Amino acid sequence: MLDFITNNIVLFITLTILIFLIVNLEMNSLFGSIKKLTPDSLIQLLNGSKVLLIDLRSSEEFNAGHIINAKNISLDDIESIKINKEDSIVTYGINDSEAIKAAKKLVKLGLEQAYYLEGGINSWIENSMPLSGEK
């Protein structure tokens, strides 16, 4: 195997680059439709268009305080949402990983562009943004 690689180094490098490009293209097609938002950029999006905000936290956490007009939907129930592919949907939770998982599910369901709030509800609170519900 090593002899083949050394004797065909140009072929090996070309094949390696081709594999990298294919993997990169596939990753971009999956993740390219998911964008992170800062609290400030979320405010701009909310002011500019109709947005569905999905709070992935437990109902107790949601009731204690959530972003105004957010809907409390669990990660398991994301697939039950009726969406149009042009909808603007932003997911958030306690951390990014759950919000990213939800955004990936939405893209798989046909949504062209999904967003998630970077840093979750904690970044929203740290930036002194308004909450709805009991605090």
Regions found by a protein language model. Give the residues of each.
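Active-site flanking residues adjacent to catalytic metal/cofactor-binding acidic residues
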Residues: I54
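Rhodanese-like catalytic fold shared by cysteine-dependent sulfurtransferases
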Residues: M1-D40, G48-V51, S59-S88, I94-K135
